[in-house]
């Protein structure tokens, strides 16, 4: 469901795939070839939420914030992520079930591990690997991680295009 909130209307690029089981409301911008999967809630009632190009927001995730939220290009937000971040840099991956609290800034090409919890206003440098509760930087992203992140994002772009054009995956 896509809804206006007062004079705030979601702006969704025509190439983006939005599941009919997602809920998007308010001042939201979704870039080209991005995808929003079933059960996802994107609620921009306190500030604007901008999602870049080629980004995927997977099933049952929530994006909301106390202020503006900027999600970069080629970002993967895994299943059941609670994301209140101020910024998620290009090419980053937030693992399944992670929690990113208000005001956090995640640098480009970083990995937030599944189940990790990023505390309020935490700043994660580019190409960091963060694990645990609370999240701690455990190392730097390697070339194999970057390739994995690109492969996941491109796979979801392709899958979103298939869903958009056919309504189902070809097996």
Regions found by a protein language model. Give the residues of each.
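Residues that scaffold, gate, or flank divalent-cation-dependent active/transport sites
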Residues: 69
């Amino acid at each position: 469901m896509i809804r206006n909130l007062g004079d705030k209307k979601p702006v969704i690029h025509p190439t983006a795939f939005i599941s009919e089981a997602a809920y998007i409301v308010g001042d939201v911008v979704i870039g080209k070839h991005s995808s929003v999967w079933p059960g996802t809630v994107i609620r921009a009632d306190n500030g604007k939420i901008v999602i870049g190009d080629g980004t995927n927001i997977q099933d049952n995730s929530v994006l909301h914030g106390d202020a503006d939220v900027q999600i970069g290009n080629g970002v993967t937000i895994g299943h059941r992520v609670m994301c209140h971040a101020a910024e998620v840099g290009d090419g980053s991956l937030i693992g399944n079930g992670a929690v990113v609290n208000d005001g956090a800034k995640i640098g480009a090409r970083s990995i937030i591990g599944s189940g990790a919890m990023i505390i309020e206003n935490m700043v994660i440098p580019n190409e960091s690997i963060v694990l645990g509760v609370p999240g701690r930087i455990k190392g730097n992203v390697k070339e194999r991680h970057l390739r994995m992140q690109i492969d996941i994002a491109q796979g979801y772009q392709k899958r979103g295009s298939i869903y958009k054009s056919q309504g189902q995956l070809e097996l």
